[in-house]
């Protein structure tokens, strides 16, 4: 019994170590491909539209209602201590530091990450990736590089727009539902907001963009055979990206806001 448990743990440990090593080599190959021609500018532009522009409605809806709910819930709690004047500050700091980047990252991971993994996994199953080798084309440069660059560029843009829309959601609830004075609410919103709050969120967004793109590409590139392999690659991309987003969010927060 104990021997079987030890054997199972050993196999899982070795498999995990192999996965970490494989992912590290894949990430290094993707990053190092930046300095090698060609640039594939048309592919980058296509991915900028897919990852950025087409994800904007999802991110906008998520952040708008998150800001609105945050204002509503903050009022419910702060009114017990007569601290309603702090609601606007809580909304803007929560969105710019944490909720904006994390929610945008999770939404993009669900929408874009799944799509990237499924697309590359399908190409792997149908041997299109092998065909790139026969055409003397580096698959990582052709498939991974444009998606990684596009995700790193577009995620901060999405987060910045999402922050603005989320603050608008909180403003509309605060002014038109909770009867706050418009000028006082806006003054409170920007009084305690500092550049580091916005910068930390944008740095997180760039890191999240890299995480989503590289994990999704890796999951698709090394997918199993058949429809089951494509499904597992898609699930793995979304789950692993989401987990790493939350972990890296804590680490970056610790880096920027040391207590």
UniProtKB/Swiss-Prot annotation:
Keyword set includes Membrane: yes
Keyword Transmembrane recorded: yes
Bilayer topology annotation: Multi-pass membrane protein
InterPro entries per the UniProt record, alphabetical: ABC_MlaE_roteobac, Permease_MalE
Cellular location(s): Cell inner membrane
Entry GO terms, CC: ATP-binding cassette (ABC) transporter complex
GO MF annotations in UniProt: phospholipid transporter activity
Keywords, sorted A to Z: Cell inner membrane, Cell membrane, Membrane, Transmembrane, Transmembrane helix, Transport
Pfam families named in the record: MlaE (PF02405)
Membrane-traversing stretches: 13-35, 49-69, 148-168, 195-215, 237-257
Protein family (similarity comment): Belongs to the MlaE permease family.
Function summary: Could be part of an ABC transporter complex.
Name recorded for this polypeptide: Probable ABC transporter permease protein RF_0080
